[in-house]
Amino acid sequence: MANISGFGITRSLIHSFDPHGKHYRPTIKPTTGFSASADAERLHRSMKGPGTNELAIINILARRTNYERQEICQSYKSLYKQDLKDDLKSDTSGDFRKVLCQLIVDTPYMLAKSLYYAMKGLGTNDRVLIEIFTTLWNDEMKAVADAYKQVLKDKGSEESERSLVTDMKKETCGDYEYALLSLVQAERDDIPILQLKAIPDKGVNSIINHELAEADAKDLYASGAGRVGTSERRITRVICNRTPYQLYLTSEIYFKMYGKTLLEHIESETSGDYRKLLVAVLRYAIDRPSLIAEWLHDSMAGLGTKDYALMRLLITRSEIDLQDIMDAYESIYGKSLLNAVKDDTSGDYRRTLCVLMGEIYNQQQ
């Protein structure tokens, strides 16, 4: 966590491969020949004097990784004794300003801020909690929890004991709270980084345990479908602690043993936000691109657009698996994600989101 970005140069490798060991496909990759100072100078020129070169800003910030954007911010501060965020805010407006500010903040802080607002005031936006906690692994969860303390400080909180966990406990209860805590406490099974790096050569079989998967399948059946009543804690301990690869294997074995999918079992034996969370964790392991495609569709469904959800999902997935999500979206909805976003957004905000998805704009457009 000593890197310039809270998640380091890349997200945890546990997100990098599908259940069969195939690399997920990002739309944003590290920039060849990257120079933070050169980008900082170009950004400064694009905002200097009358008028703003919005396309130049987009083509830099929306094509860089989060790690690169943090380096650009530091170079900008060093060169011009001014925060890049302040200059962007003074030169832009509306949703375009919002998405630029989301792009240049480090990822843990962006997610922590989303969680803060999800639990602020009356009611809780459980959709945000589920979308974020489902997609973080142990080291990332710790980084977000640390960033949450900084968000509280920035918002003027003087309660030294207040934290992500204390706020979450106030806003949730019962089995749902227990499951969230299982994720937030960052004690899920982990895989050594060298084993993750070896997946392309050795395959997923090198990091999964068939005996454990069979035992978990039996335990899950015994906790619900195979008894009167449901043991939610036993279900939670398996679903919220295993790696995605281990959960995928367990779901395969469960179907072979009982002729019913594990997902069907969870949906029939649980309810409410607790069910939504477990289903999301399981689907993240089984068919992640389709799950996140549905989240993106929901962010644009109905009257108005949930812009912060749309921004968060596109920004955070762009370096991991956004190309696979785009393919899943078109398969599910018969329309490209790119066109769906274009239909729901406008102007430079639209262009920024489209560049995150791989669209190319030249200076004449």
Curated annotation (Swiss-Prot):
It comes from Schistosoma mansoni. Ca(2+) 6 binds at residues 300, 302-303, 344. GO terms for molecular function: calcium ion binding; calcium-dependent phospholipid binding; identical protein binding; phosphatidylserine binding; protein homodimerization activity. Ca(2+) 2 binds at residues 52, 54. Annexin repeats lie at residues 34-105, 106-185, 211-283, 287-358. Pfam families: Annexin (PF00191). A pair of annexin repeats may form one binding site for calcium and phospholipid. It is found in: Tegument; Secreted, Extracellular exosome; Host cell. Ca(2+) 1 binds at residues 47, 49, 51, 91. Keywords: Annexin, Calcium, Calcium/phospholipid-binding, Disulfide bond, Metal-binding, Repeat, Secreted. GO terms for biological process: female gamete generation; membrane fusion. This is Annexin B22. GO terms for cellular component: cytoplasm; extracellular exosome; host cell; membrane; nucleus; plasma membrane; vesicle membrane. Involved in reproduction of the worm. Involved in host-parasite interaction. Delivered into the host cell by means of parasite exosomes. Binds to acidic phospholipid membranes in a calcium-dependent manner in vitro. Causes aggregation of liposomes in the presence of calcium, but not in its absence. Likely to promote membrane fusion. May provide structural integrity within the tegument. Ca(2+) 3 binds at residues 119, 121, 123, 171. Its main location: other. Transmembrane segments: none annotated. Gene3D superfamilies: Annexin. The keyword Metal-binding applies.
